Amino acid sequence: MSLAGPTETNLGGHFPGTAVENGGSSSKRESSSPGFPRNSNASDKSVDYSRSRCSCRSPSSHYDYSEDFLSACSETTARNNYLEKPTVKEKKEKKKYNVSKISQLKGQKEISVRKKHSWNVPFLNSQISVAAQRRDAMIHRILSARLHKIKELKNELADLHHKAEATVIENQFLKQVQLKHLKAIGKYENSQNNLPQIMAKHQNEVKNLRQLLRKSQGKERATSRKLREMDGELLRTKDALQALQKISEENNLPEREELTQRLSILTAKMEANDKKIQDLEKQLRLNNKAFTRQLTFENRKTLAAQAATKTLQMEIKHLQQKLKEKDRELEIRNIYSNRIVGNLHDKEDYPKVSSTKSVQADRRSFPFISMRHQETQKSEDVASWTTKSKKTTGNNGHKEKSIEIIHAMPPCITKLPNQEDSKRKYEDLSKEEQHLEAQPSLKNTGQQRYRTENQEKKITLVKEEQELPPKRIEVIHPEGEGGQEDDTEKYKFKRSPEISDMGDMPDKNAAPHIKIPFRQRKHYSFTEAIENLHHGLPASGGLANAGSTRYPHSTGKHHSHSEEMKLEHPAIAYEPSFAKSYRTKAKDTTFREKKSNLMEELFGSDYVLKNNQTSTTVMKEPEETLQSTKIHHLPPSQASASNAFGDSGVTVVNSIKSSSPTEGNRKIII
């Protein structure tokens, strides 16, 4: 890189005037002084030398201290050149001055040449010296600025060289790191690609190792077996050796014949024992086969029995559902739904009575108005009261409920001579119930308060009955009251036209054509507690009149109308008088046998066992058979409530076919 170019450009840039003057003077010199070629050539040579020395340095060469030496040499040469240049310039100016003189001599012929020459010389010398001093100062400044700029440029070049070298080194390091990263990435990619192969190799190695383990374990087992066998053989040989040693040591040995006999006997015993063992093994096999056959046969039997039991259980459930439905229907049609209503003072002051007796009577013996009043209050009271009474009697779950429902049939079944009569009676019951279901039941929704009060009182009555001990109910034989029944029949015949007139009266709740049939009344006798309960009084209180306190809690028009009818028609008012019954000390075994047989046929042996346990605490009455036969021979319109009291908690009652659609037999549980 040459230094002449930048120096000239710098000089021209900083001092353009001087550059122009120098250019002009140089051109003048070249034109006016052709006789000074050596100085110019020498200066050019010096400048070229410095340029060549400067140009010899390559841009990529490192920084050396020789550069300062070269710069100092170039400065000295430049100064010498500039010192030589003013002398040349002075000579050139002299030549110009001479030329001007010549021109002046031509124009001014009058002035002499000597005078002019002596007058102009000091002036020119002073001007030349001043100009030379100025030029020297300017040149010195220009050279110092030039050198300073050159040094700055050199420093910048050195910095750039250092930066370039650092960048080259960094690039080399970065290339090395890049190569390392590329190698690592390649290894990672290769490892990812080779993962399945590596896994397969690993699995193969594991399989091989497992096979080797198995083989080694098998070998160890075989060697252990061999060792055991060898140990056994060694022990046997030792035993044999010991026996032989003992024999050899013994001196007094028996003869061979005896020994052979002993051996034969022992061998025979061994053979016999082997035969016995074989025979026993055969017997064991045969016995096992027989036992397996028996087990399979018994399993089949058990499966068949289980299937039969399942079917029977389904049938029992179906029958129980039917019985529940029949009981509900009978409870809805119960006569005593509104009868047992008493003036109870305090529920806690009276002792509680517990009994499960069913009462049954003919509805046609009641007065016409009370019958109408009962028809309005029959459905809701009975359902709630019976459910609550069942809850109080026992909380033993679904089994006791099913037993209680099954207990509904025994009185009807026991009063019949055989199973066919019971089936026939059950069919008649179902037909009559269907007939009654077809007829619409009349309800009065305006007496809900009265019903709730009756329900609460009935619950208290049930609790009182549960606490009291059960008492024997005496039933009077109907034949003993024959004269009274004849009198009542005559009185009924007299009062029949009045009843027919009453039937013609308009009534919204009753049917249009109601006929009250004539039938004999049966007189019954009860204990004080039961009589008080019938009259609606507490069990511990005194007796109450049957006619006056029958309906103490009836309200509204029905109450007043019923009282008027009782006053006008005292014969129509229902005054139950039950027949006396004679007690039997001996138990009726035939009755129990028939009952148990029928219950076995209908419900199975389990129920009979339970029923026998419950029936031991209940007394039987001989008149029940007579009443059952009478009921069997009587027509359904004249059937009475003779079978009201049985040995079970709930009884099933035949419904009575009456002329009116709302009349019928009802059942209640006390």
From Swiss-Prot:
Signal peptide residues on this chain, from the entry's feature table: none
Keyword Coiled coil listed: yes
Gene Ontology cellular component list: axoneme
Composition skew (Basic and acidic residues), residue ranges: 418-436
InterPro entries assigned: Lebercilin-like, Lebercilin_dom
Keywords: Coiled coil
One biological process term in Gene Ontology: intraciliary transport
Positions in coiled-coil regions: 145-335, 418-468
Biased composition (Low complexity): 52-61
Annotated segments matching region Disordered: 1-63, 373-399, 413-453
Family: Belongs to the LCA5 family.
PANTHER family associated with the record: C21ORF13-RELATED, LEBERCILIN-LIKE PROTEIN
Protein name per the record: Lebercilin-like protein
Source organism of this protein record: Bos taurus
Upper classification of the organism: Eukaryota, Metazoa, Chordata, Craniata, Vertebrata
Gene giving rise to this polypeptide: LCA5L
